[in-house]
Every structure is written in C-alpha cells, then in structure tokens.
Regions:
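Bacterial N-terminal signal peptides
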Residues: 10-19
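Extracellular ectodomain segments of secreted/surface proteins
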Residues: 241-280
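Solvent-exposed, conformationally flexible loop/turn segments
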Residues: 227-228, 265-270, 298
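Catalytic cores of secreted or luminal carbohydrate-active enzymes
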Residues: 215-254
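Beta-strand-rich N-terminal accessory domains
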Residues: 23-124, 128-195, 203-206, 215, ...
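An acidic-aromatic substrate-binding cleft motif
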Residues: 256, 260-272, 324-384
C-alpha cells in the first residue's frame, strides 16, 4: 500500500509543478504589444476592454502620431549626444510577463512587464552602462501617450480620458479619468526611481492645437552611471473607480500623496501642506524653497505656515536615502490687484477697436514676446 501511495505521489508531483508554473493572477490591466518594437499599442482595463487608454501610434488616429511614440519607447542624451530606443535586440514574452532589450549607444535598456498578486501591471525600465567610461544620462523621456484628445463629443464621452500628471519626484503618479465622468480610471504610481517632469510632443497649431493635448512623455531624473552600473525606473499600473479610491490604492501600495489645502494664496494667508502614507515610521525633513523648516514624522505629516511674501513656494519632503517629493504653491500680493491688473492689460492690449471692421470690440490674441497682437505679427512676418 505504501509503495502504491509513493507511486501516486511521484506521478502527481510533475502535474503539481506544471500547475504551479502555469498559475496566473487575475489581471486588472491588459495590453497589446507591437511585435516589431516590443512597445505597447494598447492598454485596457479588464473590466472594460472597449476603451484604449493610449493613442494609436500607427498614424490612423492622428497622422503625425506614428510608431516613434509607442508606449515604452523614448529618447535620452548620453554625454550630450541624443539617442533613442525603438528597435529591440532581444524580446521574450509569455502569458505572464514580457521582457524587451534595447541598445542605444553604450546604454542597454531592459524593459520588463509583469502582473503582481493583485493583478496590477508592473513595468520597469533598467538603464545599464555597457561602455568603458562614465555615462551621463540627461533628458530621459519615456513615451506614455495617454489618450487625452478631443475629436468629437461622442468619442470623447465613450473613449477618451483626462490625464492628470503629478511629477512629484520619487512619489510621482498619473491618474487618468474618463471624460464622461463614469467610474473606472487608469492609475500609474512610482515604485522605484523618480519622475522630475513631463513633456508634451506634437502639439503645434497645425496638429489640432487645443483639440489635441499631445503625446506625453515622462521624464525620469538625470543620472550618471559608471561602467556596469544600472539605473531603474519602475511603476505600477492599476485601475480605480475615482480619485478617492486611486489615492487609497496608491497609499496602500507605498506611495506618499503630497497635497495642499490651497495652491494659490494671498501674501499674509496661511497654507497647509500634507504628506500621507502607509508608513507610521516615516521620518524626514521639510524644506521650504530649499531651506529646512521642520523635522517631521508619521504616516500623516502636516505643516502649516503663513506666507508673507509673494512668489513660488516649494514644500519638499526629504526622507529615506536621498528620496524626496514636493508640493508647489504660489503666493500673490493681492487677488483684487492681480485681477485689476489683468483686466487693464486685456482692455489695453487685447481688445480690437476699429469702427466699421466686423472684428471691432472682439478680444484677440496678444503676443507678449513681440508686444503686438498676433494678427499684426503675422502681417509683419510676411513682409520680411
């Protein structure tokens, strides 16, 4: 009997290992990848696959948005010379994960995509210096072409989003809401590395101007790599029904949410900033425009101060091993005087007055660089 049981166990073991190897977590986010570039051409919520949250990059949605702008491709400067990555040297994908390798100059870029236990998509970009000298990486830009544009009312209502980007350093995030206001949005939160800003490409007037918000690219912090050294940017893509749920999920996944009760105040008024996390043991220093103002700790850090002088006010939480995130606010001398000054400028520079002209009384665009109305600047340029 014991021998029979052993035989049964030995026979069952390979089947169990196969089952473990093939098991997969539920997927809240799914994607389509381009077979040639390894970049993403589609990004979807599993709960509603009818909406693609990123631009079609084959020229069919906008003729100027082509394969250069596919999700996950990008460009950077290496020791002052600009490079881009778009053709993989190696690619491997299964139903559980995907890896793509690129080489540009002396920098190897390894892109990995996989699902975590919660069914959220983890995406990482590893930059490796394969050269024999230090590599100064600057102006890094990773394509994240969120589908934020305005073709027509029905399309906007059913299949477009508003992308809200918080370039908050190590605690950066993006939350895309449906233009219809319906529940269900796409979130992106940083897990490793930092995002210092973002770019918007392909948005000149001839490309739709205000109806096309452009192609978004996230900008990681600059980095100098010694030979063999690597630098990783990693973020998590998840779904959330609304802003409250997104922030709750972001905090639960380790993000620090920075905010202020007001982002524009008059000089002499108080402002409250907060940094919420799921880490009660968090300790750090709070800086105001680079100057330390307080030592802080806890999972709900708050700071209140009176702003006495107008200008930009940057509240920075510095913590951990060189990590930081910031809240930027603006103080003005007086709202009434600001509005009055603006109204005087509009009346004096932007109202077209010419009796008999059908445009008389209309408000026009004023070019502050040349200090003349836009239509006059165009006439002047045509005479050059």
């Amino acid at each position: 009997m014991k021998n029979i049981m052993k035989l049964f166990l030995y026979a069952a073991l390979p089947l169990a290992l196969i089952a473990l190897g093939s098991c997969s977590y539920p997927k809240n986010i799914t994607f389509k990848a381009d077979s040639q570039t390894g970049a993403l051409s589609g990004l979807y919520l599993t709960s509603d696959t009818s909406m693609n949250w990123i631009l079609r990059t084959d020229g069919t949605q906008y003729e100027w948005v082509d394969s250069r702008y596919r999700w996950g491709l990008g460009h950077l400067r290496i020791n002052g010379t600009e490079y881009s990555w778009n053709i993989p040297t190696k690619k491997h994908d299964t139903s559980h994960h995907m890896t793509v390798k690129y080489q540009t100059g002396d920098i190897e870029i390894n892109v990995a995509r996989k699902w975590n236990r919660d069914g959220n998509l983890v995406e990482s970009y590893e930059f490796v210096n394969t050269g024999e000298k230090d590599a100064d990486l600057q102006d890094i830009a990773i394509n994240t072409p969120f589908n934020d544009n305005y073709p027509d009312a029905r399309t906007c209502y059913e299949a477009r989003c508003n992308a809200h980007i918080w370039a908050g350093g190590n605690e950066a995030y993006v939350y895309c809401t449906r233009m219809s206001g319906a529940p269900g949005g796409l979130g992106l939160i940083m897990e490793e590395g930092a995002i210092k800003g973002y770019e918007v490409r392909e948005r000149p007037q001839k490309n739709g101007s205000s109806n096309f918000r452009g192609v978004f690219q996230l900008n990681p912090q600059d980095k100098t790599l010694k030979p063999g050294e690597c630098y990783t940017i990693q973020w998590l893509l998840l779904s959330a029904d609304n802003w409250d749920e997104f922030q709750a999920k972001a905090i639960d996944n380790g993000l620090i949410i920075a905010s202020a009760d007001r982002y524009v105040v008059e000089a002499g008024e108080k402002i409250n900033v907060s940094f919420k996390s799921n880490c009660p043991s968090l300790k750090g220093k709070l800086l105001l425009n680079g100057k330390e103002v307080a030592e802080v700790s806890g999972d709900n850090i708050t700071y209140t101060t009176t702003i006495n002088e107008p200008g930009e006010k940057i509240f920075t939480l510095a913590y951990g091993n060189g990590k930081q995130t910031s809240v930027e606010c603006l103080a003005v001398s007086n709202f009434d005087s600001l509005v009055n000054h603006r109204c005087q400028f509009i009346a004096g520079h932007q109202q077209f007055i010419k009796p008999g002209d059908p445009r008389s009384g209309a408000f026009i665009v004023y070019d502050k660089r040349y200090r003349i109305p836009l239509h006059q600047r165009r006439k002047w340029q045509q005479t050059l």
